[in-house]
């Protein structure tokens, strides 16, 4: 797990994280999005470029973002650590209170890249 405080540099942090955690076949599944702006991030599936554009609007209060391998979909509710492990995501980013980001992954290389990107 990597913890990040994205205060006034939130856009730079988001852009770096998406780049660090995305591979050539990554699709991002967003759920539980709560944002200040209607044109920003919403629940759904995004390519890395689409996600960067949605995040650039800013105002993300809360969201869960799952980096999924292409061809794999998030199924069922993800509420526990066991659910995260079973869902097959490459990484999970949780944003709370507009600025606190937690990055979870079983891949140590992804966590290292996330820490360096922030």
What name fits each language-model region?
Residues 1-21:
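Short, extreme N-terminal segment that most often corresponds to the first beta-strand
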Residues 6-10, 44, 58, 107:
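Intrinsic-disorder-associated interaction segments
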Residues 9-15, 38, 73-74, 102, ...:
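Short, surface-exposed beta-strand/loop "edge" segments at domain boundaries and coil↔beta transitions
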Residues 17-22, 55, 118:
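Hydrophobic, Leu/Ile/Phe/Ala-enriched alpha-helical segments that form helix-helix packing faces
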Residues 33-94:
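Surface-exposed, low-hydrophobicity interaction/linker segments
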Residues 83-118:
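Short, compact, well-ordered microdomains
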